[in-house]
Amino acid sequence: MFAIIQSGGKQYRVQEGDVVRVETLKGEAGDKLELKPILVGGNDTLLGDEAARFTVNAEIVEHGLGKKIYIRKYKSGIQYRRRNGHRQPYTAIRITSIA
């Protein structure tokens, strides 16, 4: 059985035991979360009110920073060059059950 959950404006397809990196969530490592699925699939696909009967239980594994990306700006002819770096914070969660 799988479910599609929404977190931080993005949707993720998850199954039991998956570890997923989502946008930063409040809480410490080891805290439990309950997420509502948008869609639940398996032998039958359930949407809307039918999927709302289910809950996706998860546990926070860690907080961290993603891979560094570099942003470069350049304007020709005037020697304008800029380079900035960015590391997006994330929260890794482990899906414990879909019930």
Swiss-Prot record:
Residues of the signal peptide: none
One of the record's GO cellular component terms: ribosome
Highest rank taxon of the organism: Bacteria
Pfam families named among the record's database cross-references: Ribosomal_L21p (PF00829)
Keyword entries, A-Z: Ribonucleoprotein, Ribosomal protein, RNA-binding, rRNA-binding
GO molecular function: rRNA binding; structural constituent of ribosome
Any one of the GO BP annotations: translation
Subunit structure, interactors included: Part of the 50S ribosomal subunit. Contacts protein L20.
Purpose: This protein binds to 23S rRNA in the presence of protein L20.
NCBIfam families from the UniProt entry: L21
Family from the record: Belongs to the bacterial ribosomal protein bL21 family.
Protein name as annotated: Large ribosomal subunit protein bL21
Organism: Deinococcus geothermalis (strain DSM 11300 / CIP 105573 / AG-3a)
